[in-house]
Amino acid sequence: MPSQGKKYEYLEHTADIKFLAYGETVEEVFENAALAMFNVIIDTEKVSGETEREVLLTSPDLESLLVDWLSELLYLFEVDEVVFWKFQVEEIREEEGEYSIKALASGEKYYPESHPFETEIKAVTYNQLELEKTAGGWKAQVVVDI
């Protein structure tokens, strides 16, 4: 992994939050991007529940699938009030020109007293979005609107 063991890191950005996520596989980079995003919202080390949500999505390309994946998790947080800390992407596959993801997100009910709110994310953006296979695995760059 080119990140020297890191799952993700935050980068400088003028108005929003930008991060790089790393993984040995495309599935792992999607998991680590989700972890990076949720650590913007809350401290995921304070989450331990096993409430699961299954995520099944289809998109025209891998970059769109990454944005859709993160956007769906953000939607589940906002609507179901579940904070996630563990992500298991079971499969990402390409079929007939479309990409699909099958994944589980684990967490617990959001309680402000248990999960101090760090930063509100309004949306996952396509701004400066990158997803690429590298010599040591995969790397994704994501900007979220705050």
UniProtKB/Swiss-Prot annotation:
<dbReference type="GO" id="GO:0006388">
    <property type="term" value="P:tRNA splicing, via endonucleolytic cleavage and ligation"/>
</dbReference>
<dbReference type="Pfam" id="PF01951">
    <property type="entry name" value="Archease"/>
</dbReference>
<feature type="binding site">
    <location>
        <position position="16"/>
    </location>
    <ligand>
        <name>Ca(2+)</name>
    </ligand>
</feature>
<protein>
    <recommendedName>
        <fullName>Protein archease</fullName>
    </recommendedName>
</protein>
<keyword id="KW-0479">Metal-binding</keyword>
<comment type="function">
    <text>Activates the tRNA-splicing ligase complex by facilitating the enzymatic turnover of catalytic subunit RtcB. Acts by promoting the guanylylation of RtcB, a key intermediate step in tRNA ligation. Can also alter the NTP specificity of RtcB such that ATP, dGTP or ITP is used efficiently.</text>
</comment>
<feature type="binding site">
    <location>
        <position position="145"/>
    </location>
    <ligand>
        <name>Ca(2+)</name>
    </ligand>
</feature>
<comment type="similarity">
    <text>Belongs to the archease family.</text>
</comment>
<keyword id="KW-0106">Calcium</keyword>
<dbReference type="InterPro" id="IPR002804">
    <property type="entry name" value="Archease"/>
</dbReference>
<dbReference type="InterPro" id="IPR022952">
    <property type="entry name" value="Archease_arc"/>
</dbReference>
<keyword id="KW-0819">tRNA processing</keyword>
<dbReference type="InterPro" id="IPR036820">
    <property type="entry name" value="Archease_dom_sf"/>
</dbReference>
<feature type="binding site">
    <location>
        <position position="146"/>
    </location>
    <ligand>
        <name>Ca(2+)</name>
    </ligand>
</feature>
<dbReference type="InterPro" id="IPR023572">
    <property type="entry name" value="Archease_dom"/>
</dbReference>
<dbReference type="GO" id="GO:0005509">
    <property type="term" value="F:calcium ion binding"/>
</dbReference>
